[in-house]
Amino acid sequence: MKSRLLQRVPLKSTASLAGHPLRLRAVQTRAASSVSQRPNSDYVSFPGALKSAFTSQLKFESPESYNALPTYRVVDQHGTIVDSSFEPDLSEEAIVKLYKDMLFVSVMDLIMFDAQRQGRISFYMVSAGEEAVSVGSSSVLDPEDVIFCQYREQGVFKERGYTTKEFMSQLFANKNDSGKGRNMPIHYGSKRLNVHTISSPLATQLPQASGAAYALKLQRQQDPNSKPRVCVTYFGEGAASEGDFHAAMNIAATRGCPAIFICRNNGYAI
């Protein structure tokens, strides 16, 4: 750490103070202000190592030695509400609609997966077991919010109003497809629903989402009376291993972007 030289400013000339016991002298001090340099501090405190405890033992750390982050749940596997004080602020009609959307996605996945195996379409990916992730998260967003999906978010499209005809037109690449059949199956997109078209390369949607969120922030600054909007992006744990993931997080954090990152950890990655 660099040192700096602090000097007292004399009120009289240095010659007149030559024999004085409080004569001018150079004092060398440390320009340190972090908690780690303060007396009796047990932790390091600077960006990148917040609350990192000091230790005199050098050893390898294993992730298995730490407790995993807790998983929040509302109901158990039997459908029983875990927290009796929890009351959803949704009408019965809204809840039934969410269930129908999840059921639609599940049935469509079964039919279209078989169709792909029969050679009727060239490609398909299911979202079995992940229907609630996409449908539930999409239901709390506003229609004006911007979304970037990966390839298992059929539920997002269905919940926001993507029709059965639009699904089939995209999968079979006919003239009614918004992309005019120029894209692979399951690469849905809808300008009407504010959902960007899905792209094949893994994790490319993440920095794009951060950029879109930054644009929303700038629009809000230019027009403070406009409605606040957020940008949401979905990805899997495999995409979290890509460099684009870290770049996207860095952009969103340093720019203070209104971005929401939803990671699906299903234990599989391409």
Regions found by a protein language model. Give the residues of each.
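A short alpha-helix capping/helix-coil boundary motif
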Residues: 90-91, 226-229, 261-265
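A short, flexible beta-alpha/helix-coil linker loop
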Residues: 80-81, 154, 266-269
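Cofactor-binding active-site loop characterized by glycine-rich and histidine/acidic residues
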Residues: 107-110, 114-255
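A short, structure-level motif marking secondary-structure boundaries and short turns
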Residues: 97, 232-234, 267-270
